[in-house]
């Protein structure tokens, strides 16, 4: 299949809400997706990710902006002229058609000759592991198998791009993990440019070449899973991707390559650009749970805390620690620490300065 890029330029979409009035569902979205890459739109409910997807599909028109599939401007092109494969959240299978007929539906619309139709349907059914299911109907197969039928129907037409709107939301947790791996395998083997929509951060991190974080109709940050996790550009992204702790701090000293902050009367040197940060400024500092280190003895350069909860999760242990009224979540991948530390035990808390982050607030 020929892979093409997808380019969204200054996309706006407003809907009229009977209570809220005009709602900006999509607000100046710009996104470039390279050919054969899978990009996920990730964000909370109502952030504009599905609206963006259906505008790429042609089911809605943007109020402003342009959509390109490769070199072709498809902004005003009808959905059925765009040659796009779409996998719906509820699969949208035809209940009165067999599995074979569901998968072949798009080929019949395209008036593909019967012999070629049969060859292409069988080829796709083999790829998704549904050989032998041809005569069955949607209600006779499992949710995971229905999802694979929907995926097969979307890709059998050899679309320019593949769009997936929360395709795993109706599956149980274990099946979601297996099915997302299958989707990724197919997408890569077919070199198919794809946009995937989900609110599940783990799903997005597992399946994507890049992730576009959305909130309130805007794209906040685009990057790989690693970039978003380790280098978030805002408090919103830091909190949305993975777990993170928030600590109150005060700026003590500002230099060109670092900032010294005070957290509960302990000083920490944070390597960072310091634009707009001033001494005595109150800020929030953030750190991931796995970067915090516990010790049995409270050293001079450590915070003092009390363990209020501990949970054994096999390969890791989760601790909840009270630090001067502030709750910290701490993850240890050394399972023996579950027995090492007791509930209500006083512990030392080491915060590595290089793992601390802070973000300028708007208007600062």
What are these regions (language model features)?
Residues 57:
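Helix-to-loop junction immediately C-terminal to a conserved catalytic motif
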